[in-house]
């Protein structure tokens, strides 16, 4: 497993690891699930080429690097949860090469939690789909994609309508991914959201961060979509692994919320042609939450 320092493949050097995490920190299109899985994959590759001499600094670099990624992408609650898990499992290790194996086990376990969680979420979502359902979504959530694929596989899904999701236009990407998997999908302009809701049996959006009181931070456009669904009495579900849930409520005081949102926007991820890519959803606008534990009216902590 280990190599001499002179024999490291280029993709496992400290500079390459830092470069890969920097690229993830600047990624403005991928969802938190994709970012988290890619970060853990890079960490695993980096740690798998350790020596007795460098295992400790490498483990420290992984902990610090993923913490920094979570800070720079601080709209992503899942990355906060993953960073906390990495620090909890790896901090203090690295005194012997045996810690390389333990660190790898911890990283792989976190990856498995993410992958198995999405699989469990997809299976538990099936009762929410009426027969031959028309589903409505927006942006490009890997969780929503997995749920839709499973619903299609189990013959619960007829087709999907995806809002374009400007300013980033991630909805177009999701349509391509759905069609690649054989799912009938149509991209509609955001301005036609009302018409889209009129055709839908249910709506699904992926959360970026969920607070324990049920407040959600998600892509801009979700709030008017939720209002339209409420008006048309179309169920509106928010998907989010329990690792996305922050263990405290978000203040309802307007200035405190503005400050919280400004903290997200300050990293650059929240800026687009309209100056904002994220917005809050209040709990009373949602039919409920979908996690690896199934459907619930309130979010559950990991």
Residue ranges and their predicted role:
Residues 2-3, 8-104:
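Long amphipathic alpha-helical segments
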Residues 87-131, 144, 149, 159-203:
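Ligand-binding beta-strand-loop-alpha-helix segment within the catalytic cores
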